[in-house]
Regions:
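Ribonuclease/tRNase effector modules and their secretory precursors
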Residues: 1-127
Length: 127
């Protein structure tokens, strides 16, 4: 009898731990638009992003590649200035540039807010 209660208690602890871990890591907040920030069919480059791309020698093709294949840096992602969700995607270009691209999914398409070369500081006069 004691063994049965021990097994039930262990199972209950595992279930509660799983729920706690899942909520802590947002596993239960997944939606159908979870990867909307990776859809580059309608890419909108802000004036700031175009300027940064020019300064840092980053092409639109490299931006798309990072958006499709890059890793989300959750510590650099979050709410933008307008209250929208922003995603910081990081990866390496074909030219071995370590790039971070910050995007936000908008009604009109995917907006590229900025891009950063993480390994090299380029002179730039963008504002």
């Amino acid at each position: 009898m004691k063994r049965r209660y021990f097994i039930l208690a262990a199972i209950l602890i595992m279930i509660i731990g799983g729920i706690w871990f899942g909520k802590r890591n947002n596993f239960f907040n997944a939606s159908a638009n979870e990867n909307a920030f990776r859809d580059t069919n309608h890419l909108i480059l802000t004036k700031h992003a175009r300027c940064r791309m020019d300064c840092r020698h980053i092409t639109a093709a490299e931006i798309k590649d990072i958006i499709h294949n890059g890793n989300v840096n959750y510590s650099k992602s979050g709410k933008g200035n307008k209250g929208d969700d922003t995603y910081a995607l990081e990866g390496y270009s074909n030219e071995h540039q370590h790039i971070r691209v910050v995007v936000a999914a908008e009604n009109e398409g995917l907006m590229v807010i900025t891009c950063i070369d993480l390994d090299h500081e380029w002179p730039c006069n963008c504002y």
